[in-house]
Amino acid sequence: MSRISNLSLSHNQLRLAAFCMFILSISGCATSKSVQTAPPFPVHREPVLREKEIERNRFTVAQGEDVIGRPAVVRIEKDDTLPDIARHFSLGIKEISAANPKVDVWVPEAGERVVLPLSFILPDAPRKGIVVNLASMRLFQYKEDGTSLSVTTYPVGIGTDERPTPTGRMHVVRKAARPTWHVPSSIAADHRKKGDILPKTVPPGPENPLGEYALYLNKGSYLIHGTNKPASIGLTATNGCLRLYPENIKALFDDTPVKTPVLIVDQPYLVGQRNGVLYLEAHGPADESGALESEKLHKKLRAIEKQAARAIDWKKVKEVQAEARGIPVPIFESGRGTEMEAAKPVEVEHPETLYGKPEIPALKLHAWYVLAADVRDRIEARRLAAIINHQGPQIPARVFEKSESYRVIAGPFNDGGEAKEAAKRLKIDLEIDGIVIEPDKNG
């Protein structure tokens, strides 16, 4: 349990905090000073596109081609985080962090150019129904109207190493809007070990981890569903189900009939062509399968090289594999016209508002708070506040300076019950021993 204290903030301290605090964004695991990362390709010098002009979900698949979309870059603004950029552009957290390995995920520097990996190689699988590639943490839904093939793609959260998402053929057996979560006994046992007692069922609402929509598969108790933890999309964070952003699961739910086939594959190396250019997209494979997957890739590329009568740049292949940035990269040896053939990334304007970015309510004098941390490093404090801010459901948090330290304060909360529940969640989810701060009764 978290420590409960009668510590209180005075009226003057709260006023000082209101002036001194600066709101920041999400969780962190990077250097205190991020380094500018050059995109792995030249940026096309066109006028900057409006962000609505860049497609992120729906594409037409040209006959005989395997690559969709177009990479882009966007400049970071103050208080941005990569997870918020990722959600706005329908990317997963691992996708955007892998594409920008030297950019601080949670406290990037204003002015940095961030790669948006909005180009994808389709999985090597039948283009029918729903196909999910676990390695890229991405779902593809195919639709054919008799004359053309279209694909809609979304990032997904997948199972952990302990409870992985299974591969294989399945299909949708039923659909549910505002589903009730029937808590599996294994999950209840895991939570019980951490002091979190779950009910047998969780009704629809903000505490339901299934979100607002669910597609039930015929295999075991696996689902494709929404979430109340959007910052987990693009991570290995589920108990085996496939998890989508709330806005994406609604679109998928509306567009997916019962009996739709679902194929789940695990393909870390994707090879495809568009406009005569051969691309390789690499995602880090599991350690035990890395050598085998690399051998399969090289065998496939040697066959393509022989059939195309065009040399592959094997040094580039090695670089793409090693970096595993999840971005399609041309791998034919350079020749006249090669650069013109490859899809050029474009610069996109920064959105006025990032969709889904957590909002932090104003401080209230007579509210309850939780002191989550008191640290000497400003960046560390900002990261922690950001992590807390992106819990699901959200726990609002902010940082303000006190003497030579930085305090991370969660709140405001309406009453002691809310504050104590937030402190409990901080302990269970983040192993933070928070201190509940009562309102100043004299203020």
Stretch-by-stretch model annotation:
Residues 288, 371-380:
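Short, surface-exposed ligand-recognition loops at beta-strand->loop->(often short) alpha-helix junctions
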Residues 352-365, 376-443:
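Extracytoplasmic
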Residues 92-94, 98, 109-113, 117-169, ...:
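Cell wall/extracellular polymer interaction/catalysis modules
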Residues 55-90, 375, 400, 404:
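Primarily a LysM-type cell-wall glycan-binding module
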Residues 2-8, 29-76, 106-120, 295, ...:
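Primarily N-terminal secretory
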Residues 17-26:
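Bacterial N-terminal signal peptides
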Residues 32-33, 37, 77-107, 149-152, ...:
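LysM (lysin motif) carbohydrate-binding repeats in extracellular/periplasmic proteins that recognize
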